[in-house]
UniProtKB/Swiss-Prot annotation:
Signal peptide: none annotated. This is tRNA(Ile)-lysidine synthase. GO terms for molecular function: ATP binding; tRNA(Ile)-lysidine synthase activity. Belongs to the tRNA(Ile)-lysidine synthase family. Pfam families: ATP_bind_3, TilS_C. Ligates lysine onto the cytidine present at position 34 of the AUA codon-specific tRNA(Ile) that contains the anticodon CAU, in an ATP-dependent manner. Cytidine is converted to lysidine, thus changing the amino acid specificity of the tRNA from methionine to isoleucine. It catalyses: cytidine(34) in tRNA(Ile2) + L-lysine + ATP = lysidine(34) in tRNA(Ile2) + AMP + diphosphate + H(+). It is found in: Cytoplasm. Keywords: ATP-binding, Cytoplasm, Ligase, Nucleotide-binding, tRNA processing. It comes from Clostridium perfringens (strain 13 / Type A).
Length: 469
């Protein structure tokens, strides 16, 4: 089995002579097997091996036993072990993310700290062939493209390596037994409460029994095949990108001729352009790419907001992708109601258009008895007579609102957390203010102060039309 791992390491150029390799060590069978194999191969590969363990403080006594086990194991193998305790529940609550996500972020943060402090070259993660199969099934069920079917990569960013991705879970368990390693077992892995656990414990055994007894190997071959196709496609993108795109003024101009390319190439060129202008890659979706393709046919000057301050602008058939300057993005866009009072009284309608904050339609009308208001979260009505001026802007430090039905104010930050609005989106949600007080978090909460009551005579209905002009 060691030869199998050595061959896999060499095939994927994971390790070179003299490398310092840090093993992410949970204490479970996979990471223990990985650590033991690399410790056995130290002299052959001419490498130094270290280990890092993060105690998430989630499983009480069991977590402490895991910690003690990895320290003893590393001592026996003469491997330096770094241990860190983190209150994952606390971090999860503070950041409004799952414990699983919080745990992953803290682990990788710890690995990065150790890498920098000790000049480590590689970080070895103990994913195996079964993990790969589970990942492909999960992604297929959620919906994915060919890139998603590549699954877990043997090497990522030239730093993160997965030397036992070639091994089946059964092989790993047998290795641990033969070498009397007695790894720790995380009991939560046996509970059918997570999607991955259900796939591991139910779906894969069912497929093996009824359709394909070698489904794990089959899915790993699929991942390998897709990885080769993606490599080829990406090479073509890298060749064509400099000819079809121009980098200028902190933006990317996609030439009109790029839109004549095959869709498989065009979508990836657009994706690369988005990645070039923004570091928040995980927020770009297929819909954003499709919107950019559609923008090409909407005429010069037309613009759409993508996400995280990234906008796309049609410039005579070319499409410019750029990140809106943060100062400009947060600049207050003020509309003083007194200046448009005559227009509202005459036409009962005013349209506001703004490149950054979006487009709005304001309609003033008499309140009809028994009138039912729209349930659309982008259409809200307020008491017109309570309003003297209107501001529309993005959030600022210390912003508060008195939510509908409440008597006291609440911080916008807390509302965003309660509404599970991602951090990266919060700075780009428009706010409508009346009399310098927040009346509406567009798409979300409205204020108690300006609500329509039985004493209301006139209402102002505001419709958010989106951020395309």
């Amino acid at each position: 089995m060691k030869k199998k791992v050595i061959d896999f390491i060499k095939e994927n150029s994971m390790i070179k002579s003299g490398d310092k390799v840090l093993v992410a060590l949970s204490g479970g069978p996979d990471s223990v097997c990985l650590l033991h194999i690399l410790s056995e191969l130290r002299e052959l590969l001419h490498i130094e091996v270290y280990a890092a363990h993060v105690n998430h403080c989630l499983r009480g006594e069991s977590a402490l036993k895991d910690e003690a086990y990895v320290e003893e194991l590393c001592k026996n193998l003469n491997i330096k072990c770094f241990v860190k305790r983190v209150d994952i529940n606390k971090i999860s609550e503070e950041q409004n993310i799952s414990t699983e996500m919080a745990g992953r972020e803290e682990r990788y943060k710890f690995f990065e700290e150790l890498k920098n402090e000790y000049s480590l070259d590689k970080i070895a993660i103990a994913h195996n062939a079964n993990d790969q199969a589970e990942t492909l099934i999960m992604r297929a069920l959620r919906g994915t493209g060919i890139e998603g079917l590549v699954g877990i990569k043997p090497v990522r960013d030239g730093i993160f390596i997965r030397p036992i991705l070639i091994l089946r879970r059964k092989e790993i368990e047998e290795y641990c037994e033969i070498n009397n390693l007695n790894p720790r077992i995380d009991e939560t892995n046996l509970e059918e409460i997570y999607s991955r656990n259900k796939i591991r414990l139910k779906a894969i055994p069912f497929i093996e029994d009824n359709f394909n007894p070698d489904i794990v190997a089959t899915l790993n071959r699929l991942a390998y095949s897709c990885s080769k196709d993606v490599e080829f496609i990406q090479e073509e993108v890298e060749k064509r990108f400099p000819k079809l795109c121009i980098k200028e003024n902190h933006s990317i101009l996609i030439k009109e001729e790029a839109f004549n390319e095959k869709e498989a190439l065009l979508t990836r060129i657009i994706k690369k352009a988005l990645f070039e202008v923004s570091s928040k890659h995980n927020n770009f979706e297929l819909k954003h790419i499709q919107d950019i393709i559609a923008l090409k046919d909407k005429g010069t000057g037309k613009q759409i907001n993508i996400t995280n301050g990234v906008i796309a602008l049609n410039e005579y058939g070319d499409i410019r992708i750029k990140l809106v300057d943060s100062k400009k993005a947060k600049e207050n866009k003020v509309l003083n109601l007194e200046n448009i009072k005559d227009e509202l009284d005459k036409n009962q309608k005013v349209v506001i258009e703004d490149d950054i904050l979006g487009n709005y339609e304001l309609i003033v009308e008499d309140l009809k008895k028994g009138e039912k208001f729209s349930k659309d979260r982008f259409i809200k009505s307020f008491d017109y007579d309570k309003i003297s001026n209107i501001d529309i802007r993005f959030r600022q430090n210390g912003d508060k609102i008195i939510p509908l039905g409440m008597k006291s104010s609440k911080k916008l930050k807390d509302i965003f957390i309660n509404n599970k609005i991602p951090k990266e989106e919060r700075d780009f949600i428009p706010l409508v203010l009346f009399n310098n007080e927040i009346a509406w978090i567009v798409g979300s909460n409205v204020s108690e102060t300006f609500k329509v009551t039985n004493k209301t005579k006139k209402v102002i209905k505001i419709t958010f039309k989106g951020k395309e002009n």
